[in-house]
Swiss-Prot record:
PANTHER family named in the record: HYDROXYPROLINE O-ARABINOSYLTRANSFERASE 3 (PTHR31485:SF36), PEPTIDYL SERINE ALPHA-GALACTOSYLTRANSFERASE (PTHR31485)
Gene Ontology molecular-function annotations: hydroxyproline O-arabinosyltransferase activity
InterPro entries linked to this entry: HPAT-like, HPAT/SRGT1-like
Disruption phenotype: No visible phenotype, but reduced level of arabinosylation of EXT3. Short-root-hair phenotype. Hpat1 hpat3 double mutants have an impaired growth of pollen tubes, thereby causing a transmisson defect through the male gametophyte. Hpat1 hpat2 hpat3 triple mutants fail to produce detectable levels of Hyp-arabinosides, have low fertility and shorter pollen tubes.
UniProt source species: Arabidopsis thaliana
The protein's enzyme class: transferase
Gene for this chain: HPAT3
Protein name: Hydroxyproline O-arabinosyltransferase 3
Pfam family, one: HPAT
Topology relative to the membrane: Single-pass type II membrane protein
Catalytic activity: trans-4-hydroxy-L-prolyl-[protein] + UDP-beta-L-arabinofuranose = O-(beta-L-arabinofuranosyl)-trans-4-hydroxy-L-prolyl-[protein] + UDP + H(+)
Keyword Transferase attributed: yes
Amino acid sequence: MGKASGLLLFLLGFGFFVVTYNLLTLIVHNRSGVSNSDGSPLLDPVVQMPLNIRKAKSSPAPFHVALTATDAPYNKWQCRIMYYWYKQKKALPGSDMGGFTRILHSGNSDNLMDEIPTFVVDPLPPGLDRGYVVLNRPWAFVQWLERATIKEDYVLMAEPDHVFVNPLPNLAVGGFPAAFPFFYITPEKYENIVRKYYPAEMGPVTNIDPIGNSPVIISKESLEKIAPTWMNVSLTMKNDPETDKAFGWVLEMYGYAIASAIHGVRHILRKDFMLQPPWDLSTKGKFIIHYTYGCDYNMKGELTYGKIGEWRFDKRSHLRGPPPRNMSLPPPGVPESVVTLVKMVNEATATIPNWDTL
């Protein structure tokens, strides 16, 4: 377990070569984490997760908060809210948050450079993402890790639509990264597909954690090894019609999970890492609000998911520009998680300068 086979190197390398030789060369240069032709591993030995991992204390080491983004208005307003709440929670007791970087993979600077710490990287070559813009995420991290100066030894991979609802400690324990488990990431269900990228000789499919790359707190050292493989696997999967059809919009999440398993990296699964309204009803004991789902309710406070509600908050309603300041609060009976989310968005938009014009 943890040793990438020569067969895997051939399959991934050849698939990626078909896509773009230059990018493959760069990834190999950045230690893609597969074996040499003689079978010798380019990976660190696998460290088994200790039995007493649940009793271990969180690492006090600070972590760098990093998220990838485009220069689209939809991404910009989310990043501004996210950065606002990062600043509010960073200095509070219980927080291990260090620096912050918006990794901008548009290839050019934008008008948020002076507001949010930003590192500009190149997008994938035209057409390579095949309309699936999320494929730029692993490539962005590869470039950032290679070129940026990162003081912290740990990194939190976050997203623009994350809001820090409580101070976030370093949840990584004993060198093991921490991740949020997603119910829809089910490697065992797709074993016949997963085996194309994680062959049987590498270990059971259960070695692949039910996660994506975000939210994840991981050591910089581990991420430097995983990121090129994550990109390699994701691009190869996108170019395989069977895999692309099976995984759809979560393909890149499977890419990260499989790449981690290739490197023998297991994650501590933390359900308290994140909540997702409207399905999660309370923010108590949680750290991040992920507002990926629309919140639709009638005026009785009843959820009308799948149908536009009399009251709603859905980030997709604001694709071309930011939501207005002072949005109306949900009606009585709506879960605390949704109420808190709207209040936090309202506070951020009321405080951030030039909210409506930037």
